[in-house]
Amino acid sequence: MGIRKYKPTTPGRRGSSVADFVEITRSTPEKSLVRPLHSKGGRNNAGRVTVRHQGGGHKRAYRVIDFRRHDKDGVPAKVAHIEYDPNRTARIALLHYADGEKRYIVAPRGLSQGDRVENGPTADIKPGNNLALRNIPVGTTIHAIELRPGGGAKFARSAGASVQLLAKEGTMAHLRMPSGEIRLVDARCRATIGEVGNAEQSNINWGKAGRMRWKGVRPTVRGVAMNPVDHPHGGGEGKTSGGRHPVSPWGQKEGRTRSPKKASNKYIVRRRKTNKKR
């Protein structure tokens, strides 16, 4: 993937950029792997906004991605196409398995049309192959990692994401996460070799608010710009700093939200670095 920069022909184009999509080999998705996707607009079943700053955007169709590949152990597959997916930052690869089944996976860096992909303990250590952590050499870069055996990939699925396998001790594996956190994961959990492709996606400059609206992202209004009825930071004569420590619209203090008593804390060997205070 490369990034194409626009000339400043309009204020919205000044500084903006777009992906060149050179790796895409097909523009229409596999029909059997597409499901309808209904926009929620950030609202729950009662119609109340539970997630702010969502709504509108272009209509999308959901591509069913295979995050559990254990049922295809020993069945080779060929990469038929690399496709665009509007529901994630990474590209997706359409696999044609030898038994005739078709499935999508998140496309790793270096995987291209015509490549061969394998699953299972005997698979080679090359991008796109999926096997258990206990079968992967220490130091290997991996992505799409399960949190629990058979639970499907949960970690490192977005564009450019990768995790490093640092060590294996008994039934557990030490992983360095994209955030810098080092945590323990069951060695029976599966992962895919390589890093997720489309890493340059983070360098795209969206250029104007309208492009974010196409993505379904609505404006974020500062609390100090609101009235007192709308936010604890609202009101005041002229411009103010809010007059108190930063809080949410409901008065919750800004800062870390993870519970110090969370059960999975025992699996975190080293916390990620953060500037937030508890």
From Swiss-Prot:
Domain of life: Bacteria
Region (Disordered): 29-57, 224-278
Keyword Nucleus: no
Molecular functions per Gene Ontology: rRNA binding; structural constituent of ribosome; transferase activity
UniProt keywords, alphabetically: Ribonucleoprotein, Ribosomal protein, RNA-binding, rRNA-binding
Record keyword RNA-binding present: yes
Biased amino acid composition, Basic residues: 258-278
PROSITE patterns to which the protein is assigned, alphabetical: RIBOSOMAL_L2
GO-annotated cellular components: large ribosomal subunit
One example of a Gene Ontology biological process annotation: cytoplasmic translation
Subunit description: Part of the 50S ribosomal subunit. Forms a bridge to the 30S subunit in the 70S ribosome.
Reported function: One of the primary rRNA binding proteins. Required for association of the 30S and 50S subunits to form the 70S ribosome, for tRNA binding and peptide bond formation. It has been suggested to have peptidyltransferase activity; this is somewhat controversial. Makes several contacts with the 16S rRNA in the 70S ribosome.
Family: Belongs to the universal ribosomal protein uL2 family.
PANTHER family, sorted: LARGE RIBOSOMAL SUBUNIT PROTEIN UL2M, RIBOSOMAL PROTEIN L2
Protein name as catalogued: Large ribosomal subunit protein uL2
